[in-house]
Each structure stands twice: as C-alpha cells, then as structure tokens.
C-alpha cells in the first residue's frame, strides 16, 4: 500500500482526496476509537488510515468485534479495507460513495459487544436512502460495554426524541465468555442530508 501524500492543507491525501489519519493508541486506545472513526469515515465517504490500533492494550490490534465493525461499515457503503484481519495494527478503509440500506446480518463470532457494533452502524444508517434492519450476534451483556437493556431503555429513547426512529429487540441473550446472543436493530433514515 502506497503511503498517503501530503496535501496542501497539511492533511494527508490519497487518490486525490483527504484521508482521516488516526493514531489508534491515543487517549485510552480502545476499540471505540476505531469504531467511531469507521462510522465517521463511512458517513463522510472519506478514506480512513488508522495506525497503532489498540497499541496500549494487552492484546494489540483488531479483535473480532473491531474487525466486524469495519467489515460492516464497508458492507454498508460498498467500501474496501486493507489490513482487515484479527491482530492487524494498521488499516486503510476506503468507504464507498453511497450508503446501502435493507436487511443485514453480522456475527461477531465471540462475546464481543453487539451494542457497540450497533453504535457504529446507526449513524451511517440514519443517512441511507431507505430503512435498515441489522441482526447482530455476539455478546449483549458485558462489564466493559453498554448492555442491550441500556441501549433499549436509555440511548434509543433519547435518539427518538431527537427524531431518529431506531428500535431494538433482544432475540436471544448472550453473555461472556461464549456470546451467542442476538439482537435486532431497525431504523428509518432521517429526512434530509448530512
């Protein structure tokens, strides 16, 4: 992969456009930085280059739940990812130019947080051309992530008051260490554009 060129504004350029350059070890160095960066890149159709992913964590690099968030964003936008494998500490993500909608299924394959995956996908899906339904499999109740109940009873009512019609149904509970829980998130896009 060729390194991005310096742009006139000091930002990095790649293939003629701006690139979000993120050091994944910043602040707490958690996977949340990766998930929200991927969501923002997807929303803005702006390439993302992230280095030192989770460098300050015990297990550095992408874990299955982070990889699934990247793959899901790429799937929503028709994008491409380089470095998309468990353990990778550097990725280039090139989102597509339009946001897909419809029925999607993603399985984290571990007890990784389905709610954190949903948090990643809701912002782009709210600006798609039609309604979406996500069926997410993994963990629903962990110590280190908001639970499905928190999302259902705290976050989503706040989003609805803001005009975002997002609903969550718990299809099957899932706990560490196995996960295997399943939730479904349905939403309609917002009126207007970003």
Predicted feature locations:
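Structural preference for solvent-exposed beta-strand-turn elements
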Residues: 2-194
């Amino acid at each position: 992969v060729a390194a991005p060129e310096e742009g006139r504004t000091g930002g990095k350029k790649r293939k003629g456009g701006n690139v979000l350059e993120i050091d994944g070890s910043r602040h707490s160095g958690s996977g949340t930085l990766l998930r929200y960066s991927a969501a923002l890149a997807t929303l803005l159709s702006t390439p993302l280059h992230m280095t030192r992913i989770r460098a300050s964590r015990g297990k550095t690099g992408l874990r299955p739940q982070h990889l699934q968030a990247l793959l899901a964003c790429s799937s929503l936008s028709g994008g491409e990812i380089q470095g998309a494998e468990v353990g990778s500490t550097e990725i280039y993500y090139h989102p597509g130019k339009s946001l897909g909608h419809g029925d999607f299924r993603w399985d984290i394959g571990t007890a990784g947080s389905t709610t954190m995956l949903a948090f990643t996908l809701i912002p782009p899906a709210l600006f798609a051309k039609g309604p979406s339904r996500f069926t997410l499999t993994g963990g629903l109740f962990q110590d280190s992530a908001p639970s499905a109940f928190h999302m259902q009873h705290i976050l989503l009512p706040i989003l609805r008051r803001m005009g975002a019609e997002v609903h969550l149904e718990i299809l099957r509970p899932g706990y560490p260490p196995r996960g295997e829980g399943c939730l479904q998130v349905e939403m309609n896009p917002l009126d207007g554009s970003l």
